[in-house]
Amino acid sequence: MNPDNYLYLAALIFTIGAAGVMLRRNAIVVFMSVELMLNAANLAFVTFARMHGNLDGQVIAFFTMVVAATEVVVGLGIIMTIFRTRRSASVDDADVLKF
């Protein structure tokens, strides 16, 4: 398969994720959209690594997955805290974490 197809797919997935971040108000949907954007970047990194025959893109993708895993833990913890206090997972309710 042509590497251009993988890059087009990565661009499409990134665009869907960016649209989800900009258009949705639910914190969980925004969170999933950010994860889509990170996975699209990983696909592009791995595609470029495959095209050039080195492992740099795969190493970057691995570290991005590690960061995304920690982001899931912290992000879901924050979303659950907002939900417990406001009974809503809306992005507009994030001001509850202010002092």
UniProtKB/Swiss-Prot annotation:
Enzyme class: translocase
Keywords associated with the record: Cell membrane, Membrane, NAD, Quinone, Translocase, Transmembrane, Transmembrane helix, Transport
Compartments it resides in: Cell membrane
A Pfam family recorded for this sequence: Oxidored_q2
GO biological process, one term: ATP synthesis coupled electron transport
Ranges annotated as spanning the membrane: 3-23, 28-48, 59-79
Cysteine disulfide partners in this protein: none
GO molecular function, one term: NADH:ubiquinone reductase (non-electrogenic) activity
Function statement: NDH-1 shuttles electrons from NADH, via FMN and iron-sulfur (Fe-S) centers, to quinones in the respiratory chain. The immediate electron acceptor for the enzyme in this species is believed to be a menaquinone. Couples the redox reaction to proton translocation (for every two electrons transferred, four hydrogen ions are translocated across the cytoplasmic membrane), and thus conserves the redox energy in a proton gradient.
Protein name: NADH-quinone oxidoreductase subunit K
Gene: nuoK
